[in-house]
Design a protein with these regions (language model features):
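Long, low-hydrophobicity ectodomains and other hydrophilic envelope-associated domains
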Residues: 46, 72-98, 102, 216
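Charged, low-complexity surface segments at secondary-structure and domain boundaries
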Residues: 29-35, 85
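Generic surface-pattern signal
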Residues: 13, 49, 53-57, 97, ...
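Extended repeat-based interaction scaffolds and adjacent low-complexity, acidic/S/T/P-biased segments
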Residues: 33-70, 90-91, 116-119, 125-314
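Amphipathic alpha-helical packing elements
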Residues: 2-30
């Protein structure tokens, strides 16, 4: 780390970017802070983040993403975790990618990210975009995408569904499925995706899930009951200027001082510092012991022993 700018080292905690990438001339110290996405880009990233948080398998990192890279053009590269070693399904079926591709019956839409379109496939890189916009995102996997995409298309057609990720424009059903609240919360969802490594690098949560409801983006983090929940440290990093999100605490209910582990927990709500009407981030720190079996499955997915130890699963 000698000679490495402190600002870039701090950014790395949020994004998970490698030292090698941050030493690249395209990521100088002047770009150490995390840039804000354009409106279309932010909405697309928020829709992706909403699906990522809706469900995950046993993957090496919370939410199934090892790190993100913010590219020179302001777009995002998202590096996916590989699935468990003994999974019998296709190698991408158990990654977070399984939740993203939109499909539906003619005239309606029912699954995946509305408006997502495949733009380009190149080896292990899949470029996706939002129809009718310049928003782009690159998914980097552990294997190629071509066969998996062909299999997904064949499966959709066999079920009488349309592989909407190939459609030329966004359908009426997809447009109707994008609720007004996700548009208001786009800045928050995008900001969380661009800082997704915080869930692995800061705090003690072994499992993370989230969803949107009204003007709230809700995140639940599961923590071993024998550990310090570490919620203050997590919130401090999440809101640290200029790297974190522009959030301030509005409400807090904490029972972490109780002696019984499973009854301990914390509930916090944060709003935008400059615009409290821009939506609420609700953080729930939930104490729950899932046993050593979970630790073994996460280890089989490539989770590092140091992280498993920190989260109480080894």
């Amino acid at each position: 780390m000698k000679g490495f700018p402190k600002a870039l080292h701090t950014r790395r905690i949020y994004t998970g970017e490698s030292l090698r990438y941050l030493r690249n001339p395209n990521a100088p110290e002047s770009q150490a802070t995390i840039p804000v996405a354009s409106p279309d880009q932010a909405l697309f990233e928020a829709l992706i983040m909403e699906r990522v948080m809706a469900g995950q398998g046993f993957l090496a990192h919370p939410l199934g993403v090892s790190h993100v890279r913010i590219l020179a053009d302001g777009q995002l590269a998202v590096h996916l975790d590989a699935p468990e070693r003994d999974m019998r399904h296709g190698p991408l079926d158990e990654t977070m990618a399984q939740h993203l591709l939109p499909c539906g019956e003619p005239g309606e839409w029912f699954c995946g990210v509305a408006g997502l379109r495949v733009v380009a496939v190149e080896g292990s890189s899949l470029t996706i975009g939002m129809a009718g916009t310049t928003a782009r995102l690159i998914l980097i996997a552990h294997t190629g995408w071509t066969k998996w995409l062909a299999r997904k298309k064949k499966s959709a057609i066999a079920l009488g569904e349309l592989p909407l990720w190939e459609a030329p424009g966004i359908t009426a059903g997809e447009l109707e499925s994008i609720p007004p609240q996700i548009r208001r919360l786009a800045w928050l969802g995008s900001g969380l995706l661009r800082r997704i490594a915080l869930f692995h690098n800061v705090g003690n949560a072994y499992w993370v899930k989230g969803w949107t409801m009204g003007d709230h983006w809700k995140i639940e983090m599961f923590i071993h009951p024998d550990l310090d929940p570490g919620h203050d440290n997590f919130v401090d990093w999440l809101t640290l200027p200029p790297y974190g999100l522009s959030l301030q605490s509005e409400y807090r209910s904490c029972t972490c001082n109780r002696s019984v582990g499973h009854l301990r927990g914390c509930w916090q709500e944060l709003t935008h510092r400059d615009d409290p009407q821009a939506g609420v981030l609700q953080l729930r720190f939930h104490m729950s012991d899932v046993g050593i079996r979970w630790g073994r499955r996460l280890a089989d997915s490539g989770a590092r022993s140091s992280w498993l130890s920190r989260t109480g699963l080894s």
